[in-house]
């Protein structure tokens, strides 16, 4: 996998997409869903077809199996001219979930009318700044609301409600 980047619109202006995939025992959790979402974003942003760029389910699963430790995270970053995959430790595990997460609400609002809504793009600066501010305030995460005051997402995490054995998350259509 390449470790240098070409200065394209993704690097210069954030017109790229990414996915972060939890890895357990050498397998990407919900890998097909992550790749499908990345593929939709790639098409929307004009980044091309994933398979034509060599990012198939089989090759991605193989790379994860060969390179990812037991409990880790794999980040795929895609721009017009760049495709990179990297590993990092996954800070989330049973002990962290048992402890729970301290959260508060961000004063920054998500713009539900943005064409980028629903895509994990490289336009992520506000998320990182708000996540750092949350940590400085003793929080683990900060929650974004949309312009109408409805739940949107976390700074670096997804929002889930577990009820009756089912998992729910805010749909783009409602925010």
Q: Model segments located where?
A:
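Helix-start/capping segments and mature chain N-termini
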Residues: 1-62, 79-175
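Short secondary-structure junctions
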Residues: 65-72
